[in-house]
Amino acid sequence: MPDTVNYTLTIEKPFTHYCEVEILLKDITQDHIIFSMPVWTPGSYLIREFAKNVEDVKAENSEGKALNFEKINKNSWKVDTKNEKSVKIKYKAYCNELTVRTSLINTEHAFINSSGTFMYVKGFEKKKCILAINCPAGWNKISTGLEKGSVNIYSAENYDVFIDSPVEIGNQNVLEFDIKGIKHSICMAGKGNYKDETIINDFKKIAEEEIKLFGGEIPYKHYTYIIHLVEKGGGGLEHLNSFVAQASRWIFNDDALYKKFLGLVSHEFFHLWNVKRIRPAALGPFDYETENYTKSLWVAEGWTSFYDDVILRRCDILNNKEYLEFLNVNVNDIMRFKGRFSQSLAESSFDTWIKFYRKDENYSNSQVSYYTKGALVTLLLNIEIIKSTEASASLDDALRMLYEDHKKDQSKGYSEERMKEVCEIVCGKKLDWFWEKYVYGVEELPVKDYLNDCGVLLTDENETSSGILDVEIKNDNGKLIITKVIAGGTAYESGLNANDELIALDGTRVDPVLAGALLKNYKEGDEIKVLINREGFIKELSIIFLKPLPKYKIIESENKTETQQKFFNKWING
């Protein structure tokens, strides 16, 4: 039985977008060995069929003699190893999609999403993995969370850790800072208008604040940030001691966009604890062959989405006004749409494999995001704990308790029952009613009441507005194309559809500038004719303006009571 699984990654012609992978096993005794490519990547809950990028599979023994093998399903190859002492499988992988969950190789650099590149060996998943990297001449830097050995040699204690460690190869700008003697490396891949010192200072502030929240202990030997600076893009993906994120390369001089990016940094770094260590039982050890279902993604992502902006406030990257403006976006993303009455948080978590990554124009009318609604419910839960304990405790304490659970037994995650129990212990009372209404149920969230408990006001900016269709529209070369029709609004009830082109309102030709001005002439109860282009046919519809759907605004009260101020301080400061 081999002690290690040895991988070699070779990038010979980066302009082809291919890499070559070899997997070597020595001292084998099995009559056959199965090699499989994962079908999904942890943290991104969609079957992605990474085996589609695999080509030219070969198998041989230690002398280079070809071994018989067959493909036994969509992502697995079975090699005949009877009477053989070693086996090597070789294949090419096509890498030409730069996202946080896929791989790219080009003449500038390579980003390797390990779960979509490296097969695992059935029965050998717990063995140490060693990776040798052969990169093109002139590429001098490798950034990864893997443990570094000799030149271009890296290792992981098992396959789970191995593929939870993406790899960036090229000549990226690497910035560094230390916290308590632990090195943090920031890989900035691509051109951008950032300043090294600003990036280092802000990333360090965020890391220190989150480490403090969890008691000051650092759960890793080193940490790697991989930031891809792109023309257009965004998003991030957490890993065990690293994360990868995308940012538009020219955002760094725009204060609002830069702070939004720092929210992403805060989010992905927070996952170090919430999901990578404090995790639902279904999320590790992983089954890479199929969906891994859980009803607790609203905790894994929703709690993290609540804290990502709170952390920015705690380390003074945001002030109170800016923080509440960020929160306001989440409130409107949920409270304006009927999807909050159609799908519970538990259902949203469970169905992520078939819904969340396959959004259509009706998504907001029929579903909720376990990120966004999860963050709102987390806010309410936090305030419930604060109120019930007279601000002597908060959700921070529940997180720390769950983290202590993890440290006692790192082999398994929490059950839904244990997670709720911890919240009840911290809150000092049963919370079955809260879960039934807001996690497993679809009752209206009492956001206004909970915010008011903390001296924060929620108002409706559309209360006195008029002439609102309640649609989302894009300007397509001067054409006004409806992209989303909000259920319950004027357009929805009048029969307008997504993909309709607005041509005229009440006999007047509209354009992107004129449309808004014309709509202001109409009030609730007015009826007008709307001319549209629907799939190449011109149609005229009658619409009656309804009361506009709410558009919320959150502001901090200037006249908080002593109790409201105490609760607000606990929410913001922990």
Task: Name each model feature, range by range.
Residues 5-7, 19-23, 87-89, 129-131, ...:
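Hydrophobic residues positioned within well-ordered beta-strands of beta-sheet architectures
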Residues 1-40:
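Early extracytoplasmic/domain-onset interaction patches
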Residues 47-56, 60-220, 232-233:
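Non-catalytic architectural context of zinc metalloproteases
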Residues 125, 193-205, 255-256, 260, ...:
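Soluble non-cytosolic domains of exported or imported proteins
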Residues 175-297, 303, 307:
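Juxtacatalytic substrate-recognition/specificity segment
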Residues 308, 318-574:
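C-terminal recognition in membrane/secretory proteostasis and scaffolding
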Residues 243-252, 277-278, 289-340, 531, ...:
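Post-HExxH zinc-binding segment in Zn-dependent metallohydrolases
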